[in-house]
């Protein structure tokens, strides 16, 4: 919608309540440039680190310093595992992040699981759960250790929730485990192809091996947190590697059970924005319930003369995404409260 891309009021010039940075799909590898699986888009494996350095330099000198940065997953490329340099590449990227003056919240994508097991990630620097906020009086809002998700409060009356969109997945877990068997059964029920990464002929093309989903346990937890946020009159931003809204994403990139996640979000009034990566070419749509779904353009497919990151400035009535390079600016107005 065109009206989302133009300033809506003179208040745009006022100071934001707070700001935060967003970046997705860095997918660094010490490799020559290559192409995506369809060989239709170029990938700049080495230059992604230079893009990250540029983003950090920008964030560090912004007048409205971000309170944190959301890293939306796929921090290093799966090729690192083939060359047995996963730990080395991760260390290089994490050392680059050390130059940033604010905390980073990391989500986990498919490329994390091409390189590392879930157990490894849980004890790595990519586990940013230590940054979570807990609601002491409401233990039901404390996440289980069975999935990687948490919530935090960057500013009073705003809550950010990081989801684990590979909670249901055949990636990164022991093939002899019951959960692997359960997830493989689920995948094969929806995808009869020999090549499980192929969506060919599928009525639900999101059921491919490079995607995943949300367990009922995690969805129940999400529902509890959103219930608290409704009661507490908070505005909520949800963060996930995988997108959940078809109008904002290629259907082959959606979370397996995106419908279940949407139905919970739509049963609450507090969610204002859902941020995801994974698609690389970006996407945006406002759903019928006024939730803004933003899929961030991926660093990995961004030419050396461009950029792909953004800063979101948060105001009492809206969020303004100030994009860099191929990330477009967006004005995301909060849905109006229904008249009493």
Swiss-Prot record:
Residues involved in Zn(2+) 1 binding: 25, 27, 74, 280
Reaction catalysed by this enzyme: CDP-choline + H2O = phosphocholine + CMP + 2 H(+); ADP-D-ribose + H2O = D-ribose 5-phosphate + AMP + 2 H(+); CDP-glycerol + H2O = sn-glycerol 3-phosphate + CMP + 2 H(+)
Segments crossing the lipid bilayer: none
EC number of the protein: 3.6.1.13, 3.6.1.16, 3.6.1.53
GO molecular function, one term: CDP-glycerol diphosphatase activity
Record: residues binding Zn(2+) 2: 74, 110, 241, 278
Record keywords, A-Z: Acetylation, Hydrolase, Metal-binding, Zinc
Keyword match Calcium: no
Necessary cofactors: Mg(2+)
Residues with N-acetylmethionine modification: 1
Enzyme class: hydrolase
Assigned protein family: Belongs to the ADPRibase-Mn family.
Function field: Hydrolyzes ADP-ribose, IDP-ribose, CDP-glycerol, CDP-choline and CDP-ethanolamine, but not other non-reducing ADP-sugars or CDP-glucose. May be involved in immune cell signaling as suggested by the second-messenger role of ADP-ribose, which activates TRPM2 as a mediator of oxidative/nitrosative stress.
Complex formation: Monomer.
Protein's name in the database: Manganese-dependent ADP-ribose/CDP-alcohol diphosphatase
Source organism (scientific name): Mus musculus (Mouse)
Lineage, highest ranks first: Eukaryota, Metazoa, Chordata, Craniata, Vertebrata
